[in-house]
């Protein structure tokens, strides 16, 4: 009598485990990442401390390259690509360092952009997260690039296709440096579970400093804020139309220990498009 009872218990346990696992998988499928104001992201614009950051950059940059194989390998490959169009071997000023940073960010392999974006989305969650953030130098160089480098335009329509089913706030920021394209067909080439039609006023054209120059890439910074104007829902995807409404930062000059002096703080907005 004991053996059948044991078998029954084991079978019951296996069935329940399968049900729980299936439920968890279904829950994960239904979960929709929310695009909101991304308060935990590192949105530092370095207002008022550019000179200080420039002075501290060499030692910070060297220490981070030495600490990260991914970062150092991506930088080495990016430097090689950058040198192809130069008559000198190494960057001589901040502008040229930022150009190499853009090459490194846009590389398909090694995929620095994946780890960098993921870390940037939570790097300002708290002091411990910022201390552990391994890309402070890259963040500064890309921020400098989006503010002072690249093709300048007042505002421009760009497009982005993603394989993620986002829910979105009435106002949102991407919370990371975000690649978009001037060409809608290029953006549609990527997975388009959520397709963005954006008007950006802070993004910069980086085709000349991108590893994939044919993509007509425009880089949108994490501190640019967008207002959703409409959402078109389809059976398998959605299109989100949004326009730039300026910039805001919850954090400024963290590395040098300064406080918010110049930047606009970010407010919460609760209306959601599911």
Where are these regions (language model features)?
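Cleavable N-terminal signal peptides of Sec/SRP-targeted secreted and luminal proteins
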Residues: 3-22
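A positional/structural detector of protein chain ends, strongest at the extreme C-terminus
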Residues: 1-4, 272-274
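ADP-ribosyltransferase catalytic core
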Residues: 168-255
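Short N-terminal segments immediately surrounding and downstream of signal-peptide cleavage
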Residues: 24-45
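Intrinsically disordered, low-complexity terminal/linker regions enriched in Pro/Ser/Gly
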Residues: 249-274
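Internal glycine-rich, Lys/Arg-flanked active-site/core loops of soluble domains
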Residues: 50-51, 55-204
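Intrinsically disordered, low-complexity segments enriched in glycine/proline and serine/threonine
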Residues: 5, 28-33, 118, 211, ...
């Amino acid at each position: 009598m004991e053996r059948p009872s044991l078998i029954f218990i084991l079978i019951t346990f296996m069935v329940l485990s399968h049900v729980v696992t299936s439920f968890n998988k279904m829950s994960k499928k239904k979960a929709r990442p929310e695009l909101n104001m991304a308060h935990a992201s590192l949105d530092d614009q370095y207002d008022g401390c550019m000179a200080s950051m420039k002075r501290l950059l060499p030692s910070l940059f060297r220490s981070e390259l030495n600490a990260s194989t991914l970062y150092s390998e991506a930088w080495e490959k990016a430097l090689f690509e950058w040198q192809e169009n130069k008559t000198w071997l190494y960057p001589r000023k901040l502008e040229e360092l930022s150009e190499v940073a853009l090459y490194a960010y846009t590389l398909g392999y090694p995929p620095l952009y994946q780890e960098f974006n993921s870390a940037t989305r939570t790097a300002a969650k708290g002091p411990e997260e910022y201390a552990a953030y391994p890309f402070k130098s890259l963040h500064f160089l890309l921020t400098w690039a989006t503010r002072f480098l690249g093709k300048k335009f007042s505002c421009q329509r760009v497009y982005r296709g993603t394989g993620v089913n986002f829910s979105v706030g009435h106002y949102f920021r991407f919370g990371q440096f975000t690649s978009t394209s001037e060409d809608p067909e290029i953006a549609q080439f990527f997975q388009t579970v959520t397709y963005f039609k954006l008007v950006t006023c802070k993004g910069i054209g980086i085709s000349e400093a991108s590893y994939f120059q044919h993509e007509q890439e425009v880089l949108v910074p994490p501190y640019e804020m967008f207002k959703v104007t409409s959402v078109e829902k389809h059976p398998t995807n959605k299109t989100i139309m949004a326009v730039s409404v300026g910039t805001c930062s919850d954090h400024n000059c963290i590395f040098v220990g300064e406080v918010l002096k110049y930047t606009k703080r970010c407010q919460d907005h609760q209306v959601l498009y599911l």
